[in-house]
């Protein structure tokens, strides 16, 4: 119902901002607690033990395996093993001619240094459906090597306008908040605040608050 509610909000014109990553991965369910009270325990078997429930509407399974890939809503999704051991990576903007970059001074392909993309990192996967959008663009493409040393991964930031008029923005980075306010770094000692990325965030949220029409 939560996932359906997010879809419904978007389809009724409510803009959505995913200012993190890996927000929608597993279908989980609620069960009774040891005292018999309903909907008190969140259940997610993941890979540790087979889920005894076979009903796909209740089974704890990846949304994409249910035919409802996360990127159909947010625009990006976590690739298999798409995360780092620790820290973060520079952010590489693309399509900087588009309105989210107004006043940022950023240029396509020129990396913004710092621990800005991490540690769970989303991508757009062309083997799954894209959002049902009237306008869609990826505005970040940062290559990375995952925690196992595998290359070939790329972080993506996505923004699109749904047919309802809603804007949907996904940073694709668990650490995006580090770019916005002091105190965010892997060692607690470095400053990852970037005025250019604060401005990008302001541009997107400002247009959402203006009804997507500014």
Language-model region placement:
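Short alpha-beta junction capping motif
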Residues: 1-26, 191
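Extracellular ligand-binding/catalytic regions of CAZymes and related secreted enzymes
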Residues: 25-46, 84-88, 92-214
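E1/E1-like adenylate-forming module used to activate ubiquitin-like modifiers
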Residues: 27-32, 36-81
